[in-house]
Amino acid sequence: MRKNLSFQMKRKRTNIFKQHPKGLYFLFFTELWERFSYYGMRAILVLFLISETSGENPGLGWSKVEAINLYSWYTALVYFACIPGGIIADKVLGKIKSVILGGFLLCIGHLLLSVDKISFFFSGITFIVIGIGFLKPNISSLVGSLYKKNSTLREQGFTIFYIGINIGAFAAS
């Protein structure tokens, strides 16, 4: 009997991930990547801004005050952008299109940051802020829409999703 119970417990553990909709894992990795992007920017933005303009790893050579000002605006605007991003999703685009658009804008923003021109830097930051504004307020509600309201898997699904958020944040730090 004990052997049978052990087998059932193992079987239950290995199948838990197969019980969830496939869309959960797409959203898991999307949010992991977005949080890696956000916390990665938070980790290196000020360092890049205050680094000397020449040398092995050139930056923009800003003062610490200027760098902290931009960092503050970036952080505030990322979360403020979620308000119009959510409204546009609710009234015009829908959640799915908003998440896709947000991810696309994030990619463009990071590509623009790779170009060594100040105008591309500001454009990249702008695309990232707008991208997060579309993605962040909508992706969590998409996770919820994968499950029936009273599904026992719904809570597990959100836990898996939040694990992705934490992995992304941890990896970026």
Language-model segment annotations:
Residues 68-89, 136, 170:
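Central cavity-lining transmembrane alpha-helices of secondary-active solute carriers
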Residues 2-39:
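Cytosolic juxtamembrane N-terminal segment immediately preceding the first transmembrane helix
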Residues 134-148:
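Intracellular juxtamembrane helix-capping segments at the cytosolic ends
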Residues 109, 120-135:
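Hydrophobic core of transmembrane alpha-helices in multi-pass small-molecule transporters
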Residues 43-66:
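Short amphipathic helix-loop junctions that connect adjacent transmembrane helices
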Residues 91-103, 150, 154:
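Cytoplasmic membrane-interface "Motif A"-like loop-to-helix N-cap segments
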Residues 78, 155-173:
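Glycine-rich segments within core transmembrane alpha-helices of 12-TM secondary carriers
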